[in-house]
């Protein structure tokens, strides 16, 4: 009889709301750690939903909307067969981000001399903070930036490879042929952006700027 009672006690403990919440929290930590690999090497997940809102199965399938952020206060869908629960979760993520190392004036270029990688809580940074230093290659500041300030994508733009009024080469490629002609750029554009060109004939064409400043058109 004592053995039976102990069995019931163990079962009650295993399936208690607290134990289930801890297990779901551990699964969520693993799930977010996998998705944040390459950005964060230290992830702390806190389940905020009450125990009565947890999924009933032991290993639910987690998902989020494609545009959802991966840290801070987020909502996660937990599915068990036909059951679907929405869980409120707080995710703390620590990793590297790009910060200003020396003052940068508006219009100034971002270089290894004036930016650096810093380590900190990604979930506490401003929106669209740059995490990959390669994203600022050939970038120009849109405002004055102070040392220590996280670099956000809204603060920078790519340097113009082509400027309005500049003479450019237009290269039209088709199946088995390539045609070159000269024209005048009608707008500023960075590499991989679209530029409109007025040809000597007066015709206006549009193409993609390459790294050499040529305008490429695929026919």
UniProtKB/Swiss-Prot annotation:
Involved in the assembly process of the P-ring formation. It may associate with FlgF on the rod constituting a structure essential for the P-ring assembly or may act as a modulator protein for the P-ring assembly. GO terms for cellular component: periplasmic space. Disulfide bonds: none annotated. The keyword Ribonucleoprotein does not apply. This is Flagella basal body P-ring formation protein FlgA. It comes from Salmonella typhimurium (strain LT2 / SGSC1412 / ATCC 700720). Belongs to the FlgA family. The keyword Signal applies. It is found in: Periplasm. One of its GO terms (biological process) is bacterial-type flagellum-dependent cell motility. The lineage of its organism: Bacteria, Pseudomonadati, Pseudomonadota, Gammaproteobacteria, Enterobacterales. Keywords: Bacterial flagellum biogenesis, Periplasm, Signal.
């Amino acid at each position: 009889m004592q053995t039976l009672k102990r069995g019931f006690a163990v079962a009650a403990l295993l399936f208690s709301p607290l134990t289930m919440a801890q297990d779901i929290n551990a699964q969520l930590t693993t799930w977010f750690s996998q998705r944040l690999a390459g950005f964060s090497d230290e992830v702390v997940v806190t389940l905020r939903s009450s125990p009565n809102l947890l999924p009933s199965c032991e290993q639910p399938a987690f998902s989020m909307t494609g545009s959802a952020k991966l840290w801070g206060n987020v909502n996660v869908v937990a599915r068990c067969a036909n059951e679907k629960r929405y869980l409120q979760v707080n995710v703390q993520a620590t990793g590297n981000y790009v910060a200003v190392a020396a003052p940068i004036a508006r219009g100034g270029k971002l270089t290894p001399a004036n930016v650096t990688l810093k380590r900190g809580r990604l979930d506490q940074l401003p929106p669209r903070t740059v995490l990959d230093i390669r994203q600022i290659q050939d970038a120009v500041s849109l405002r004055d930036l102070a040392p220590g300030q996280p670099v956000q994508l809204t603060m920078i733009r790519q340097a113009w490879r082509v400027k309005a009024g500049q003479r450019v080469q237009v290269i039209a490629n088709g199946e088995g042929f390539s045609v070159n002609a000269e024209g005048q750029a009608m707008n500023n554009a960075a590499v991989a952006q679209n530029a409109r060109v007025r040809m000597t004939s007066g015709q206006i064409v549009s193409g993609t700027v390459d790294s050499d400043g040529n305008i490429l058109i695929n026919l």
